[in-house]
């Protein structure tokens, strides 16, 4: 239940309440008490001027940025520091893009600006778009969906209205044979896709991934189904495992390394993400893709994360990021950073209504009811629905929707191109995304055909 603000508007609440604050009227989230700056001494001086008795403390060093903790009001301090010419920003919190129409971004209800642009009142849905081949075919004929990644069998609706995970077990009748056969094919000198997400399933890993080149970066990068111990699947549990399976389906044999930067509730602090990006081991950067299926809005821009992304890009690494599920044209980060391959979602008949859009979105790929790997043998406390279907009993496969899953499809397409054509990641982007002859949807970019 959302809490009431003094003005009567609902205040976002949820599993992030103790570790996330929301900026009223601005639609972004941040870590309470934390500011990132390139001038820790200058920022400390501003903090002491504002709150004489407060003692802020220096935290981690993140490249040129330093984490300052113990701040009474991060938004006030960041604003005053910027007025003094100091680079400073809140430690933004970003969320997994895994819950379409839920709403997907908890900060969106903080103010009118975050989701104020109705998707159906934009050029994305203008008449000329509907004349394209994406809309001219049915789900079985569309080249975008002629792949085992997309499950065509309808699945039952969730019986409970309680917001938990939006992942659903693969229903009876969905053929996972072709998807399973895509795993375990090892290419010569495979490219690497690095996934920053909720981690990778440990002992609950699906059998389809047991003999492949998918692995967690360390023992600490483990995805878990129910970290809060309430008996229900957490909202973003399995997110990283699902994404890793998508990459392997599209690009068999690709080395997939999964890092944990998000909680199973779906939130992750910018400082933790920046530290992970800065510490990545990239032995062959020109054949490496980083896939990010999270994002959010920012005070102005997430400068610390942009530094980390630009650093990787300068090495030759390609960064792919999901555009978000807010149904808005407002840019989200990291997808909107320069040079990032930002990815929106399409369904079998055109743009997914939940997908973010705009000139900053470079590509789109299937993102509705995708079939991929999930926890094997997990059965939560969700009661069976009126059709007798257990909606949180998983056997290693699941259906999920969101731009979170469109991004790894594109990352996989790039990895497959690198392996097949012996090219760099940058050259793969030119062929898969930037080639002028490719089909495009206004405000959603190039349609990435995953056949």
Question: Where in this protein do the model-derived segments appear?
Answer:
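Mature extracellular/periplasmic domains of secretome proteins
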Residues: 183-188, 245-249, 267-291, 301-319, ...
């Amino acid at each position: 239940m959302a809490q009431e603000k003094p003005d009567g508007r609902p205040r976002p609440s949820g599993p992030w309440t103790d570790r996330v604050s929301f900026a009223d009227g601005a639609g972004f989230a941040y870590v309470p008490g934390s500011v990132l700056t390139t001038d820790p001494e200058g920022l400390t001086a501003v903090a002491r001027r504002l709150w004489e008795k407060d003692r802020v403390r220096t935290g981690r060093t993140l490249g040129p940025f330093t984490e300052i903790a113990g701040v009474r009001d991060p938004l006030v301090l960041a604003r005053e520091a910027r007025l003094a010419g100091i680079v400073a920003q809140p430690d933004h919190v970003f969320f997994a893009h895994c819950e379409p129409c839920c709403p997907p971004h908890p900060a969106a209800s903080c103010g009118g600006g975050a989701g104020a642009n109705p998707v159906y009142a934009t050029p994305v849905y203008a008449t000329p778009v509907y004349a394209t081949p994406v809309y001219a075919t049915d789900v079985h004929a569309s080249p975008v969906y002629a792949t085992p990644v997309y499950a065509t069998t309808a699945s039952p609706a969730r019986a409970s209205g309680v917001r938990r995970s939006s992942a659903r077990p693969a229903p009876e009748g969905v053929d996972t044979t072709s998807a399973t056969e895509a795993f375990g094919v090892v290419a010569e000198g495979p490219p690497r896709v690095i996934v920053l997400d909720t981690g990778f399933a440990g002992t609950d890993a699906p059998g389809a991934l047991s003999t492949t080149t998918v692995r967690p970066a360390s023992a600490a990068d483990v995805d878990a189904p129910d970290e809060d111990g309430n008996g229900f699947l957490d909202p973003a549990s399995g997110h990283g495992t699902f994404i890793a399976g998508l990459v392997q389906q599209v690009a068999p044999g690709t080395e997939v390394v999964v890092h944990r930067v998000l909680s199973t509730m779906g939130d992750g602090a910018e400082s933790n993400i920046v530290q992970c990006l800065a510490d990545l081991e990239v032995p062959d950067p020109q054949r490496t893709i980083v896939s990010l299926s999270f994002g959010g809005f920012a005070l102005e821009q997430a400068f610390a994360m942009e530094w980390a992304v630009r650093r990787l890009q300068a090495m030759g690494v390609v960064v792919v990021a999901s555009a978000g599920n807010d149904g808005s044209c407002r840019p989200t980060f990291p997808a909107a950073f320069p040079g990032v391959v930002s990815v929106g979602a399409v369904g079998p008949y055109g743009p997914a209504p939940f997908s973010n859009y705009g000139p900053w979105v470079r590509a789109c790929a299937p993102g509705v009811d995708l079939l991929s790997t999930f926890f094997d043998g997990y059965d939560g406390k969700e009661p069976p629905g009126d059709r007798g279907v257990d909606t949180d009993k998983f056997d290693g496969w699941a259906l999920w929707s969101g731009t979170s899953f469109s991004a790894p499809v594109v990352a996989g397409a790039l990895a497959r191109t690198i392996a097949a054509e012996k090219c760099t990641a940058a050259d793969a982007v030119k062929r898969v995304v930037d080639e002028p002859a490719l089909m495009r949807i206004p405000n959603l970019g190039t349609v990435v055909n995953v056949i």
